[in-house]
């Protein structure tokens, strides 16, 4: 009796193993072709030891279990998010040698080390997006002892001006300010030159009037206080994105509704920060596929996939990169690329942190180091307010 039970379990185990193999190969074939998979084609490519009838029976069971769905036009099967999850969990990252060499060559565009840390991370995201041909985002903490190095003023109309501050670490801060009155021609350029000389501790060129100088100081002090408020008090990591238009080359996102869902999810700062922080201490890539995204953020199924991986300075995670794409991503190649990418980035960031003695802080509702007094705010961020003056 015991022998019969053991033989029955063995036969069941072998059948389950074959069904699993059919699922993996059907998913693999779908990822390669982006076409529904039929039993005949699967037999010809990866399952020559199985009959077409047996494969169809396995397809039917996998469809019942929610791993495959039938394409009503061709009769072939299409993997669901459950199938892609199973595929990811049972395959290791893989890259061909020529792919590795091409990626390593592309990564030489990144600097060996740099103090311009935010700009370099943005450059890294552009490189990664170019390699994968997919949208990329990354989260970043705030880096300490930053300072403003450049100011630009851009007129929108007669009463509004865009104020652009750029910092030593590559941060860019913009805000819109209202002018008290319409300025004469070239007046804004003279004010901009005055403020740039101030930042560089150079004397004024004397070309602007006292009224223009007073207005420049008022505008500068206003925008610096706004900048310091954002810089010192933040509840989420800084989030940067690039390459969103690359979604358009995938058939899945040619449907306006699917594209809108994917973009809405990727551009939701709260959801993306939550997703990027989920496995911040896991050094390998993590895939969130289909309904898994909805489970995490409590949203409708976006019918896409996001793959995340943290990036490190030495043994400390600083943030994470995220890649957005359709559910039929080439997971093995994406995982392998992300691992190579973050290994290189870790070397760069570690060298930069030790060479320039950089430090950072994470978001919190209130930061005890930053008070409401402007003098203490400016000491914390290495930005000085101009002397207070009244407009004449």
Swiss-Prot record:
UniProt keywords, alphabetically: Repressor, Stress response, Transcription, Transcription regulation
One GO molecular-function entry: DNA binding
Pfam family, one: HrcA
Top-rank taxon, per record: Bacteria
Coiled coil (residue ranges): none
Entry keyword annotation includes Transcription: yes
Biological process, per Gene Ontology: negative regulation of DNA-templated transcription
Gene3D superfamilies tied to this protein: 3.30.450.40, Winged helix-like DNA-binding domain superfamily/Winged helix DNA-binding domain (1.10.10.10)
InterPro entries: GAF-like_dom_sf, HrcA, HrcA_C, WH-like_DNA-bd_sf, WH_DNA-bd_sf
Family: Belongs to the HrcA family.
UniProt cross-references to PANTHER family, sorted A to Z: HEAT-INDUCIBLE TRANSCRIPTION REPRESSOR HRCA (PTHR34824:SF1)
Function text: Negative regulator of class I heat shock genes (grpE-dnaK-dnaJ and groELS operons). Prevents heat-shock induction of these operons.
Protein name as annotated: Heat-inducible transcription repressor HrcA
Source species: Chlamydia trachomatis serovar A (strain ATCC VR-571B / DSM 19440 / HAR-13)
């Amino acid at each position: 009796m015991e022998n019969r039970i053991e033989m029955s379990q063995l036969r069941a185990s072998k059948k389950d193993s074959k069904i699993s193999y059919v699922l993996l190969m059907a998913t693999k074939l779908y990822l390669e072709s982006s076409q529904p998979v039929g039993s005949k084609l699967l037999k010809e490519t990866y399952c020559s030891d199985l009959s077409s009838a047996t494969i169809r029976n396995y397809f039917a069971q996998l469809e019942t279990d929610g791993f495959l769905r039938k394409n009503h036009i061709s009769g072939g099967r299409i993997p669901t998010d459950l199938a892609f999850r199973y595929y990811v969990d049972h395959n290791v990252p893989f890259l061909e040698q020529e792919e590795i060499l091409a990626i390593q060559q592309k990564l030489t565009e990144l600097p060996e080390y740099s103090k311009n840390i935010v700009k370099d991370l943005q450059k890294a995201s552009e490189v990664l997006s170019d390699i994968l041909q997919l949208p990329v985002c990354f989260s970043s903490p705030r880096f300490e002892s930053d300072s403003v190095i450049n100011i630009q003023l851009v007129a929108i109309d007669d009463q509004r001006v865009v104020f652009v501050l750029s910092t030593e670490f590559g941060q860019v801060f913009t805000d819109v300010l209202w002018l008290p009155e319409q300025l004469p021609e070239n007046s804004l350029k003279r004010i901009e030159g005055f403020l740039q000389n101030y930042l560089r501790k150079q004397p004024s060129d004397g070309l602007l009037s006292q009224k223009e100088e007073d207005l420049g100081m008022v505008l500068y002090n206003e925008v610096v206080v706004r900048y310091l408020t954002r810089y010192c008090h933040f509840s989420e990591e800084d989030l940067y994105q690039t390459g969103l238009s690359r979604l358009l080359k995938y058939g899945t996102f040619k449907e306006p509704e699917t594209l809108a869902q994917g973009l809405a999810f990727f551009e939701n700062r709260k959801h993306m920060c939550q997703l990027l922080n989920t496995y911040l201490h896991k050094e390998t890539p993590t895939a969130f596929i289909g309904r898994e995204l909805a489970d995490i953020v409590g949203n409708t199924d976006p019918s896409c996939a996001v793959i995340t991986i943290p990036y490190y300075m030495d043994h400390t995670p600083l943030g994470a990169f995220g890649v957005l794409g359709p559910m039929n991503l080439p997971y093995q190649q994406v995982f392998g690329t992300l691992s190579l990418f973050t290994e290189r980035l870790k070397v760069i960031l570690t060298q930069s942190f030790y060479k320039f003695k950089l430090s950072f802080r994470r978001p919190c509702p209130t930061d005890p180091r930053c008070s409401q007094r402007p003098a203490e705010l400016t000491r914390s961020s290495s930005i000085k307010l101009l002397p207070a003056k009244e407009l004449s």
